[in-house]
Curated annotation (Swiss-Prot):
InterPro entries assigned: Ribosomal_bS18, Ribosomal_bS18_CS, Ribosomal_bS18_sf
Stored Pfam families: Ribosomal_S18
Protein name: Small ribosomal subunit protein bS18
PANTHER family reported for this sequence: 30S RIBOSOMAL PROTEIN S18, SMALL RIBOSOMAL SUBUNIT PROTEIN BS18M
UniProt keyword terms in alphabetical order: Ribonucleoprotein, Ribosomal protein, RNA-binding, rRNA-binding
Family of this protein: Belongs to the bacterial ribosomal protein bS18 family.
Function: Binds as a heterodimer with protein bS6 to the central domain of the 16S rRNA, where it helps stabilize the platform of the 30S subunit.
PROSITE patterns, per database record: RIBOSOMAL_S18
Annotated GO CC locations: cytosolic small ribosomal subunit
């Protein structure tokens, strides 16, 4: 069985790029809740790198910013 990408007219997976690197961010502000909401699920969980395409360099400060926003009650810990 051939890979789908090798077949004519097959499915080609798009490479994910880091949002923060692409838009030349210098830091992530925990008060920017609209940005942080893009990286959490509807249940309030932090989305993993493999889903968002965020680089390891930016995933760590992103997680810290989300946790700070939760602690300051800007983002919910869970949504029901």
């Amino acid at each position: 069985m051939q890979d789908r990408k090798n077949r004519a007219g097959g499915f080609r997976k798009r490479k994910k790029v880091c949002f923060f690197t692409q838009n030349k961010f210098t830091h992530i502000d925990f008060k920017d809740t609209e940005l942080l909401k893009r990286f959490i699920t509807e249940r309030g969980k932090i989305l993993p790198r493999r889903v968002t395409g965020t680089s390891a360099k930016w995933q760590r400060p992103l997680a810290v910013a989300i946790k700070r926003a939760r602690h300051m009650a800007l983002l919910p810990f869970v949504k029901e």
